[in-house]
C-alpha cells in the first residue's frame, strides 16, 4: 500500500500522511506484538515514527526508555527508510535534573535516546511539554547545539500554548538559533481547542502539525461505554496517564457525541474509527495524525482513513456536531 506523503512544515523532509505512535510499546503491548505493529505500519506505507524517552505510557522510572529500545531494535538495518521522531522533558530518573528543558538535561537526554534507538541522529527532536522553570534562551541554545552537532536534524514542540510557541519562534529568529519546525498537539473530534489559536499560528509560521489522539484515546472507536466504566488495559486505566485521559474525555457529553457520530458513520458506510481519522486529515493544516495500536489489526481502519476524502456535506455535519469542543483548555 502506498500512503500519500507531504512535507513536514516548510522543510524538505517528506513524511507519510499518517505517523505511527509507539507509546503502548513495552507495557500495554509486549515487544513481539510491537514488532508486528511496526511491520504492519511499514507494509501500509507509514515511514514516520514517533516515540519519547519517557514511554511506555502508564509506566514509571523503571520502564522509561523501554519503548525507544524496542523501536531501536526493530529499526536495525532499515533506519534509512524511516523518519524518526522522539521527545524529551519528561522525568526519566530520580535526580532533579532528570527532567525539564535545561541545557544539562537536553544534552544528556539526546545522547541517551540515541543509544536506546541505536542511531546516530534523530530526524525530529521535540520538547514533550513546556518547561517554564528553565529560561527559554537556555533551552533554545541547547537545542541549537544538538542540531549543530549533527545529532538532530529538526526540532519541534508538543503540548505548547500558542503564546509560548510564538515567543520561542521570535527568540530563535532574533538570536539566529535553530527554529521549531513542527508542533504535536492533541486534536480530534472531541478536542478541538487548538483551532482557536495554535493552528492559526502554525499556518502563519508554516509549521508542521503532527497531532496526537485522533481517536480520543480510543473513545472514538466506539468500544467504550460509560455504564461499564473504563476497560482494563486501555489508556483510561494505565498508570498515571489514566486520570488525565479520563479527565479529558470520560463524561456524559462525550459519550453522547460519540453515539451521534456513530450514527453519521453508519449512514456514510464507514467505521467510526476511519471517519474520525479522516476528519483530522481533512484539515489542511494537519501534516500527519499520530495513530497508535495495541494490536496490528487495529491499524486497518486507520490506514483506510488516508484514502478517504470527506465530501463537503459530511465534513460540515461532523464539524457542526462537535463545534462545542472548540472551547476549553488546550492543554487538558
Predicted regions and their residues:
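Structural motif corresponding to the early beta-alpha repeats
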Residues: 54-55, 77-101
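Short beta-strand segments at enzyme active-site cores
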Residues: 48-52, 84-87, 121-126, 156-157, ...
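Active-site mouth loops of central-metabolism enzymes
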Residues: 22-32, 92-104, 130-134
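Acidic (Asp/Glu)-rich catalytic clusters
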Residues: 10, 43, 72-80, 115-118, ...
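N-terminal binding-site loop/beta-alpha segment at the start of enzyme catalytic domains
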Residues: 1-82
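Short, acidic/polar
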Residues: 30-41, 101-117, 165-169
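Active-site groove signature of glycoside hydrolases
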Residues: 114-133
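Beta/alpha (TIM)-barrel catalytic core signal, keyed to glycine-rich beta->alpha loops juxtaposed to Asp/Glu
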Residues: 130, 134-321
Amino acid at each position: 500500500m502506498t500512503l500519500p506523503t507531504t512535507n513536514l512544515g516548510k522543510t524538505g523532509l517528506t513524511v507519510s500522511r499518517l505517523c505511527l505512535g509507539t507509546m503502548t510499546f513495552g507495557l500495554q503491548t509486549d515487544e513481539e506484538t510491537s514488532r508486528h505493529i511496526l511491520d504492519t505500519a511499514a507494509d501500509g506505507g507509514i515511514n514516520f515514527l514517533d516515540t519519547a524517552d519517557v514511554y511506555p505510557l502508564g509506566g514509571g522510572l523503571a520502564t522509561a526508555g523501554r519503548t525507544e529500545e524496542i523501536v531501536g531494535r526493530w529499526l536495525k538495518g532499515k533506519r534509512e527508510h524511516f523518519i524518526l521522531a522522539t521527545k524529551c522533558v519528561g522525568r526519566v530518573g530520580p535526580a532533579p535534573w532528570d527532567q525539564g528543558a535545561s541545557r544539562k538535561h537536553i544534552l544528556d537526554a539526546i545522547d541517551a535516546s540515541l543509544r536506546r534507538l541505536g542511531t546516530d541522529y534523530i530526524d525530529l527532536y521535540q520538547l514533550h511539554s513546556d518547561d517554564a522553570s528553565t529560561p527559554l534562551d537556555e533551552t533554545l541554545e541547547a537545542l541549537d547545539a544538538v542540531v549543530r552537532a549533527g545529532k538532530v536534524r529538526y526540532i519541534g514542540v508538543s503540548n505548547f500554548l500558542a503564546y509560548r510557541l510564538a515567543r520561542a519562534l521570535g527568540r530563535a529568529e532574533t538570536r539566529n538559533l535553530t527554529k521549531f519546525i513542527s508542533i504535536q498537539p492533541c486534536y480530534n473530534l472531541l478536542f478541538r481547542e487548538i483551532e482557536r489559536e495554535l493552528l492559526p499560528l502554525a499556518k502563519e509560521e508554516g509549521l508542521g502539525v503532527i497531532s496526537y489522539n485522533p481517536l480520543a484515546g480510543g473513545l472514538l472507536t466506539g468500544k467504550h461505554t460509560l455504564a461499564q466504566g473504563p476497560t482494563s488495559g486501555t489508556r483510561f486505566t494505565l498508570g498515571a496517564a489514566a486520570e488525565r485521559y479520563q479527565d479529558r474525555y470520560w463524561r456524559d457529553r462525550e459519550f453522547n457525541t460519540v453515539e451521534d457520530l456513530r450514527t453519521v458513520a453508519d449512514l456514510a458506510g464507514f467505521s467510526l474509527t476511519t471517519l474520525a481519522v479522516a476528519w483530522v486529515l481533512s484539515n489542511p493544516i494537519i501534516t500527519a495524525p499520530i495513530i497508535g495500536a495495541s494490536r496490528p489489526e487495529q491499524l486497518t481502519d486507520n490506514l483506510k482513513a488516508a484514502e478517504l476524502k470527506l465530501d463537503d456535506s459530511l465534513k460540515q455535519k461532523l464539524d457542526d456536531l462537535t463545534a462545542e469542543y472548540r472551547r476549553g483548555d488546550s492543554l487538558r
